[in-house]
């Protein structure tokens, strides 16, 4: 075998906070500062990868070894007044999958700025029907997650644990009213299954 190793990589610099979103020709493990145009500050979250499965990186950190994208999003940590920007506000600038805000009546061409704020803390995990519209497979994601949390191997197998990977549940974390880390739960379930069936 012969060949030439190249460490070159094309990286997409994305996100609403990036001053010049575009593709960069760079190399594996490059400094993120070279891709963020030196953007600094606590108000921006730098993600090595995409917003759903990427990892939080320092602005002076490095590109992940398997990543082909960096994302810059507003941190969303500033306090909001209850009536003007909090949960009692009319929410005319907020995106909602559950039609909690009247923005679902607006034209589909409206663009929203997504922030990293979860909008609350972890809550009880209940069946709400929010996962199914965004889940890419024809299985019952909520029941599968509940069986993983209960460590019920028979139920996990019947519900299709062997067909999924943690990344498949990434989009489920966005509309989740329970604010739980679904990908971590699925990863733990797969690890427990491997250990049990070893």
Please state what every model-predicted region is.
Residues 1-52, 56-99:
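Hydrophobic alpha-helical positions that pack around
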Residues 53-198:
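Gly/Ser/Thr/Ala-enriched C-terminal appendages of enzymes
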């Amino acid at each position: 075998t012969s060949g030439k190793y190249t460490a070159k990589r094309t990286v997409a610099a994305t996100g609403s906070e990036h001053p010049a979103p575009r593709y960069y020709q760079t190399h594996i493990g490059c400094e993120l500062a070279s891709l963020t145009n030196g953007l600094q500050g606590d108000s921006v979250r730098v993600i090595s990868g995409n917003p759903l499965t990427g990892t939080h990186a320092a602005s002076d950190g490095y590109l992940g070894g398997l990543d082909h994208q960096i994302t810059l999003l507003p941190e969303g940590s500033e306090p909001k007044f209850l009536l003007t920007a909090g949960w009692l506000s009319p929410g005319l600038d907020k995106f909602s999958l559950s039609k909690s805000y009247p923005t679902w009546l607006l034209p589909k061409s409206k663009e929203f700025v997504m922030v990293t704020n979860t909008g609350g803390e972890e809550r009880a995990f209940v069946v709400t029907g929010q996962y199914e519209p965004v889940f890419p497979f024809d299985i019952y994601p909520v029941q599968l997650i509940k069986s993983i949390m209960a460590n019920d191997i028979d139920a996990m197998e019947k519900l299709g644990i062997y067909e999924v990977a943690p990344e498949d549940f990434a989009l489920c974390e966005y509309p989740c009213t329970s604010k739980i880390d679904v990908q971590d739960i699925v990863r733990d379930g797969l690890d427990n299954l491997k250990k049990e069936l070893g």
